[in-house]
UniProtKB/Swiss-Prot annotation:
CDD domains: cupin_RmlC-like. GO terms for molecular function: DNA-binding transcription factor activity; sequence-specific DNA binding. Residues 183-281 form the HTH araC/xylS-type domain. Keywords: DNA-binding, Transcription, Transcription regulation. The keyword Cell membrane does not apply. This is Uncharacterized HTH-type transcriptional regulator YdiP. It comes from the Bacteria. Residues 200-221, 248-271 bind DNA. It comes from Escherichia coli (strain K12).
């Protein structure tokens, strides 16, 4: 038997009216997943590594996350995520927005120059259970639940991550700055990957030679500008294949290819299987039994 009573004294962590809201949840179990560099302008991502090893590049720094590690990628951070080839990762991600901790900027959770990857400590089992619940409930909900329920998840996770990262290791040097021009080019490609983009267009827009752009971009991001665009398109195509019922032709058009056959050939070349095979393998219909077998039996948060 145990009972604990609480007084009415409250500690306000958030600025009034600035509590977290959930904008996106993602579950990734593709053993060859590689996102490519990208940016979220208005979201902060809270990531939980369920199993395996994931590699994160965040603002020029490389971090390796293992099972039961938690990761924070704040809005505006240039980042890339890749599953380890030898120990593929399964990850869960909640993207939050609209929150502001006391004394911090909007959507900022980390202390300045904090390491964004740590082992989950305080509330570890609760974090695991919350992500498990979202993995089970969301695929079955079909918008039947109110947004307040999802925001309750966001609120709880934000506080748990905040408490875990409060004393995380901090680097005195802070974040390494990349070449500003090359970073601007990547931001442009990230935001306009659906458009027809040529090296000549980039050269004219950014007033730099084609050879300079190709050399410096490839040196910085280990991929050429054009292959980055292709990778970005393939990443979006994967999400559409596994989370929508859109036809291949519609997906092809949405990611920037007018010719569906050309899209299918590129997908096969870069992903290693056809779009239809990828959809069959990773379609968002994972069985609840598979999830529950790897997590503790969840405590139901809904009646």
């Amino acid at each position: 038997m145990y009972q604990r009573c609480f007084d009415n004294a409250s500690e306000t962590l958030f600025v009034a009216g600035k509590t977290p809201r959930l904008s996106r949840f993602a579950f990734s179990d593709d053993p060859k997943w590689e996102s490519g560099h990208h940016v979220h302008d208005n979201e902060t991502e809270l990531i939980y590594v369920k199993k395996g090893v994931a590699r994160f590049t965040i603002d020029s720094s490389l971090y390796v996350a293992h099972a039961d590690d938690i990761v924070v990628i704040e809005r505006g951070r240039l980042h890339a995520v890749a599953s380890d080839v030898n120990d593929p990762a399964t990850t869960c991600t909640c993207a939050l927005y609209g929150f502001q901790f006391q004394g911090a900027e909007e959507n900022q959770l980390l202390q300045p120059h904090s390491c964004p990857v740590i082992a989950a400590g305080q509330g570890k089992e609760v974090i695991k259970t919350l992500f498990n619940e979202l993995s089970v409930i969301l695929p079955q909900s079909k918008n039947s639940q109110t947004s307040s329920l999802w925001d309750a998840f966001a609120y709880t996770l934000a506080i748990l991550y905040y408490e875990n990262f409060k004393n995380a290791y901090r680097s005195e040097q802070g974040y390494i700055k990349k070449d500003v021009l090359i970073k601007d080019i990547l931001f442009y490609l990230n935001n306009n990957y659906r458009e027809k983009i040529t090296l000549e267009q980039l050269s004219k827009k950014f007033r730099a030679s084609v050879s300079y752009i190709c050399h410096e971009f490839t040196k910085e991001y280990r991929i050429s500008p054009i292959n980055y665009v292709i990778q970005r398109r393939m990443t979006e195509a994967k999400w559409s294949l596994t989370n929508t019922e859109l036809s291949q032709a519609e997906i092809s058009w949405r990611v920037g290819y007018e010719n569906v056959d050309h899209f299918a050939k590129l997908f096969l070349r870069h992903v290693g299987c056809s779009p239809s095979d990828y959809r069959r393998q990773f379609k968002n219909c994972f069985a609840e039994q598979e999830i529950l077998s790897e997590f503790p039996q969840p405590v139901s948060l809904v009646g």
